[in-house]
Amino acid sequence: EWALLNFFVNEHLGDGYELILPPHMLNYECGYVAGQFPKFVEEDYWIANPTSADRKFMLPTAETALVNLHRDEVLTLDELPRKYIAYTPCYRREAGSYRAEERGMIRGHQFNKVEMVQYTTPEGSDAAFAEMVGKAERLVQELGLHYRLSKLAAGDCSFSMARTYDIEVWIPSMGIYKEVSSASNARDYQARRGNMKYRGEDGKLHFVNTLNASGLATSRVMPAIVEQYQNADGSITVPEVLRPYMGIDVIR
């Protein structure tokens, strides 16, 4: 897993992203700006009572912290786009996920993930989204995993997101594809909640666009590697891109 995380982070840094190590405990306002509250307030772990004045919740995804970095700020055109990544554990209650296919590493209350977030102008938003989807796809391709790219229907997208694509890897033992990355464009939804603007060439203030994508979640990538790379004798061939980090070619 550490080899995967190092591979992901190094790939993103090489593409011009800035690494952030955000806090794991956030206040209610962070969840509100990200578009997770009040609708999903019951899905997170709370340090204090959700209705108390000093309420804090555990980070469900690094996106929640990263989209609050420029809250109540005015950026310049020269500062856009801003590209951030963060590696964090993610903490989720996952209430109601009791199916057999959701056991073990596939869906846990704590898992590790590298997250990408961009702040862009509205004009650069679509290009940024295509870039982020392409980056997540490239990571899966470089690992040599069988996968598919799915565009979510409007009814399946979060209410705060204008567009979402999922990247899913094949899990042979389950006979299904499971999501390892979700890329979304919030347009100016989060920016309006967080009062995040930039000054345009016309001298006026405009809301930025925010985008996020997993790059990637390790808890589902690892089972996919184990199963797709397993040999007849039970050994596991290490994907070529991970060998410099692990120092071995085969796990026996």
Language-model features, listed with the residues they occupy:
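TRNA-recognition modules of translation machinery and tRNA-sensing kinases, especially anticodon-binding
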Residues: E1-R252
